[in-house]
A protein has these predicted regions:
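Short, charged/polar surface micro-motifs in flexible loops or helix N-caps
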Residues: 6-9, 19-22, 38-39, 74-75, ...
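Charged phosphate-binding loop/patch that engages nucleotide di/tri-phosphates or the phosphate backbone
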Residues: 118, 122-145
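Active-site-adjacent beta-strand/loop module that shapes the phosphate/pyrophosphate-binding cleft
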Residues: 69-106, 118, 140
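Residues that scaffold the ATP/ADP-binding catalytic core of kinase and kinase-like folds
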Residues: 24, 40, 128
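Alpha-helix-centered segments that form part of catalytic cores
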Residues: 107-123
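Short connector loops at helix/strand junctions that flank enzyme active sites
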Residues: 27, 32, 61, 74-78, ...
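N-terminal strand-loop-strand
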Residues: 1-31, 81
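The catalytic Nudix box helix
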Residues: 32-67, 121
Length: 145
């Protein structure tokens, strides 16, 4: 999770999940850049790789603050770190995925994994982030005190 300190607060960079299932959703549709990895890949290495795959930008260098793990409603376990840095959301070139759309149409369409990213203050981020991932925001806030 990329974060910055404008003024006296904290902002985090979150991505809005792409594809037609998320197009009209806001609450619960924002996430830290993330992805799956195999047991033989270190989680930190996977986190950096997924940042690049999802945003199309090199992951920032800097001190990695471990934020631990959360279990999402779908059962997936997400491990996250926070790194202080800055980037222009307009600079992202998101990775894509393919799915049949519309359903049962036989047509395969490509969609961005993340359709946009934004810097959000912690209060706004808590309103829209995937519910389980809100714990990462709390842990970052605690670390930053």
């Amino acid at each position: 999770m990329l974060f910055r300190r404008p003024g006296d607060g904290l902002e985090v960079l979150l991505g809005h999940m792409g594809g037609p299932l998320w197009a009209r959703r806001d609450v619960g549709a924002w996430t830290v850049p993330k992805g799956e990895y195999t047991p033989d890949e270190p989680a930190w290495t996977a986190a950096r790789r997924e940042f690049q795959e999802e945003l199309g930008l090199a992951p920032p260098d800097g001190e990695a603050v471990p934020l631990g793990e959360v279990r999402q409603a779908n059962g997936k376990i997400v491990t996250a770190w926070a790194v202080e840095g800055d980037l222009d959301p307009a600079a992202i070139t998101p990775g894509t995925f393919s799915m049949e759309w519309p359903p049962r149409s036989g047509r395969i369409a490509r969609f961005p994994e993340i359709d946009r990213v934004e810097w959000l203050g912690l209060d706004r981020a808590r309103e829209v982030i995937v519910k389980a991932q809100a714990a990462f925001l709390d842990r970052l806030a605690e670390h930053s005190r």
